């Protein structure tokens, strides 16, 4: 016990020693002379009247957002261009946010809209921002290492159709105290709310006590719950001098009662005890009673497609509803900027490694934060890996197709280039052709950065296809027109093919729906049954 206490003390001290101090000038850009005339992005003004922004304490700021609508022009000179749409104007409680992202020259922010200044007793209020649902907890992300500025939104976009909740975000351009700070992403955060995670606050007993909670696997930041189990190597051996830490995100630890703290700790402990047991794979009594398996699979595939070297061990947010609604833990995607081939460390630039198998590398490199042992256990359960492969095949027939991903990248990057946002951001924060931590590849310009991202994703998908047994040239049974979906359009095309024998764009191998070696009216019957929710013969 004393050894654990000493270790935690050393970790806390090391964090304090490396954390950079706030600066009175609020970290202005290298070039403070960049200005906006007009832009297709919303314009966000923050004014703190020269007051130093802090990391751990909020200050009062004034915020104004001009947003004339998607695709419309926004003008910075509101006198010359009166009558523009004000998306929000009022006070906010502002502070810096982030861990590794806070170490960059350009800082991300957390803010909460207020009814009046903090000095006058202001309280947070829920507002709708840039078309995103009302809430009182927001962030301004500052993409810096990712010079394409699309990775975070790209990961969210691809995960959103599969996961219950994935925070949304919008590009904007930011002024702070009249100085242009560049392109930011105004985002929802992982929090409780009608338009976020619709969770009840936990009560004191019974079913009310069992939800809702938001926790996070992350760094040691007191207070934390320390797992009873150490992380493991790729062969399953315990790494006894490393620990897994769970942070309390909602409710905040100081707002929780003793009963609530004890409950969520005991629930995590019960889950981990089950994973550590010899019969953890049992469908009825094993880990499946504690986690939403498909949600964990979706989370894993999102992290692996991006080859996030921080995955599972940092920003590992998960939540739990009340038992009467759903007793299982579910993961939420967050912090996806150092992904898709950026990091030089831990093999993050490579396309042919699994992130969930990084513990050996992390330990050798002296990293203090390793992946919880349950991800090792999951990926050594044949039933889980079979579901993982099936889900990957679903992804590949849906939105995780190279051409669709390239279209999303083109759409996101197009927003940034259409009216000069990149051309303003780049001189404010000059980086092209120079090293920016932790990039393994050094892009020479924006087109080069986008080209590298596309090539990396293409290679990553090909490798994952090979590892997970998916043949991109094969067509799913019933997908007669080969569009990746099975619906009434396939029924129509199959009927036309049977009647005429020469319909174009027919995938004959996918048309033998009853798998008897012939394509005839019986296949139409089988296909209609499947489209209506049945199963194949």
What are these regions (language model features)?
Residues 5-15:
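Sec-dependent N-terminal signal peptides
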Residues 17-21:
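Sec/Tat signal peptide C-region and signal peptidase I cleavage site
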Residues 22-150:
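Conserved NTP-binding catalytic cores of kinases and kinase-like/nucleotidyltransferase enzymes
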Residues 33, 40-42, 52-54, 58-59, ...:
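Middle-to-C-terminal accessory/interaction subdomains
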Residues 63-79, 150-164, 262, 266-276:
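Zn2+-dependent metallopeptidase catalytic core
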Residues 108-112, 136-142, 149, 157, ...:
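Structural recognition of the beta-strand scaffold that forms the well-ordered cores
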Residues 112-118, 126-143, 163-167, 179-301, ...:
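Internal "kinase-insert"/substrate-recognition segments embedded within catalytic cores
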Residues 470-537:
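Cellulosome-associated attachment modules in secreted, modular CAZymes
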């Amino acid at each position: 016990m004393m050894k654990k206490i000493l270790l935690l003390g050393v970790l806390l001290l090391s964090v304090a020693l490396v954390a950079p101090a706030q600066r009175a000038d609020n970290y202005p850009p290298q070039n403070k002379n960049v200005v906006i005339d007009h832009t297709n992005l919303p314009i966000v003004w923050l004014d703190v009247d020269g007051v130093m922004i802090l990391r751990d304490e909020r200050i009062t700021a004034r915020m104004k957002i001009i947003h004339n609508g998607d695709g419309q022009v926004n003008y910075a000179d509101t006198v010359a261009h009166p009558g523009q749409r004000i998306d929000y104007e009022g006070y906010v409680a502002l502070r810096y946010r982030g861990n590794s992202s806070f170490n960059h020259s350009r800082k991300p922010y957390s803010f909460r809209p207020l009814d009046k200044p903090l000095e006058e007793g202001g309280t947070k209020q829920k507002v709708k921002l840039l078309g995103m649902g009302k809430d009182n907890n927001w962030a301004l992300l500052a993409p810096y290492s990712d010079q394409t500025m699309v990775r975070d939104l790209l990961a969210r976009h691809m995960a959103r159709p599969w996961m219950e909740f994935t925070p949304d975000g919008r590009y904007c351009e930011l002024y702070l105290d009249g100085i242009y700070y560049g392109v930011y992403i105004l985002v929802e955060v992982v929090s409780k709310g009608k338009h976020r995670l619709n969770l009840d606050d936990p009560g004191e007993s019974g079913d009310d006590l069992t939800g809702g909670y938001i926790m996070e696997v992350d760094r040691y930041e007191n207070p934390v719950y320390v797992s009873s189990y150490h992380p493991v190597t790729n062969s399953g051996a315990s790494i006894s001098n490393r620990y897994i830490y769970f942070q309390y995100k909602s409710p905040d630890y100081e707002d929780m009662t003793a009963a609530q703290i004890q409950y969520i700790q005991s629930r995590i402990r019960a889950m981990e005890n089950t994973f550590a047991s010899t019969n953890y794979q049992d469908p009825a009594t094993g880990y499946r009673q504690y986690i939403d398996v498909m949600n964990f699979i979706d989370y894993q595939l999102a992290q692996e497609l991006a080859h996030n070297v921080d995955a599972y061990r940092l920003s590992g947010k998960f939540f739990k509803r009340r038992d009467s609604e759903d007793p299982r833990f579910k993961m939420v995607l967050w912090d996806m900027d150092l992904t898709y081939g950026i990091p030089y460390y831990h093999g993050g630039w490579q396309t042919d490694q699994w992130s969930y198998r990084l513990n050996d590398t992390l330990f050798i490199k002296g990293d203090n934060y390793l992946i919880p042992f349950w991800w090792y256990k999951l990926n050594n359960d044949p039933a889980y890996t079979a579901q993982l492969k099936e889900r990957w095949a679903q992804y590949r027939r849906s939105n995780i197709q190279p051409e669709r991903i390239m279209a999303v990248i083109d759409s996101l990057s197009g927003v940034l280039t259409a009216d000069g946002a990149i051309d303003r951001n780049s001189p404010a924060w000059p980086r092209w052709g120079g090293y920016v931590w932790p990039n393994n590849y050094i892009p020479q310009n924006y087109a080069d950065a986008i080209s590298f991202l596309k090539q990396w994703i293409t290679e990553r998908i090909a490798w994952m296809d090979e590892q997970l047994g998916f043949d991109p040239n094969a067509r799913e049974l019933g997908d007669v027109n080969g569009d990746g979906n099975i619906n009434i359009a396939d029924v129509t095309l199959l009927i036309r093919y049977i009647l005429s024998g020469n319909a174009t764009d027919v995938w004959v191998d996918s048309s033998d729906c009853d798998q008897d070696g012939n394509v005839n009216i019986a296949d139409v019957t089988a296909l209609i049954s499947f489209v209506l929710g049945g199963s194949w013969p």
